[in-house]
Amino acid sequence: MGSTRKGMLNVLIAAVLWGSSGVCAQYIMEQSQMSSQFLTMTRLIFAGLILLTLSFVHGDKIFSIINNHKDAISLLIFSVVGALTVQLTFLLTIEKSNAATATVLQFLSPTIIVAWFSLVRKSRPGILVFCAILTSLVGTFLLVTHGNPTSLSISPAALFWGIASAFAAAFYTTYPSTLIARYGTLPVVGWSMLIGGLILLPFYARQGTNFVVNGSLILAFFYLVVIGTSLTFSLYLKGAQLIGGPKASILSCAEPLSSALLSLLLLGITFTLPDWLGTLLILSSVILISMDSRRRARKINRPARHK
């Protein structure tokens, strides 16, 4: 198998597994009465420990980032506003609605990123970016109102946490680039997850005796942490390195689709026609942004003409 096909397969598998992890989280919260806060705490702590262990085995100097005062502060900011907030708001959205809706709303983050950079740089967005912003807004409108502006198809709390999740995901994607370039992805993400989980520990550790535990729930939690977080993250990284960010972004659109399909098959949650239309519009915005990124990359790499 060629490197491009292998990369595409890795990203596609990662996207499907990420979609299934949201469904798995919904199953755990519904069947065990576990709060989204407690699940966020335990998921972050265990996933962080696994990623740091993998990083250490890989030969990374995982403690270097902590020994640098300035970078340690940046890591703390990323841990709180990035890793902790993106996981907590995502699970809160699931708790208030369902995994498929939460996943689709979080996919607004690429549009938020390009809109933010256009504002900061005071540059007019290109036609593809403008269309992406427009389709994401229309898609969100259809998803949350079913086309009726006088009513919401999801609760106001679900809408609030879903939008917050998208903004948190935008921050999570853009903020740590300097840290990752200096220390590597696994140490930065591993520490951010572990620190984020430990921050919640004093507030929610006592909830550990207030929910149902059985064999299927333990298996589901193992899947969520090991398969849906650690393995998935590694697959996506390897795939994105082989095929590049724009292609990886397009293939990652399989995540909300797999979440919607698995929600239907495993949890009995159905999407209506406006839900599907809204989802497809939001996913199309991601594809448009990826197309714009590829166009810009080709323009930059194009050799200059000589007279």
UniProtKB/Swiss-Prot annotation:
Keywords attached to this entry: Cell inner membrane, Cell membrane, Membrane, Repeat, Transmembrane, Transmembrane helix, Transport
Stretches that traverse the bilayer? 8-28, 46-66, 72-92, 100-120, 125-145, 152-172, 185-205, 217-237, 264-284
Topology class, membrane: Multi-pass membrane protein
- Give the Periplasmic membrane side ranges: 1-7, 67-71, 121-124, 173-184, 238-263
Pull the Cytoplasmic topological domain ranges from the record. Answer: 29-45, 93-99, 146-151, 206-216, 285-307
Record's subcellular location: Cell inner membrane
What is one GO cellular-component annotation here? plasma membrane
Q: Which residues form the EamA domain?
A: 16-145, 167-291
In which broad location class does this protein mainly occur, judging by the first location in its UniProt entry?
membrane
Keyword Cell inner membrane listed: yes
PANTHER family membership: EAMA DOMAIN-CONTAINING PROTEIN, INNER MEMBRANE TRANSPORTER
Name the family: Belongs to the EamA transporter family.
Q: What is this protein called?
A: Uncharacterized inner membrane transporter YicL
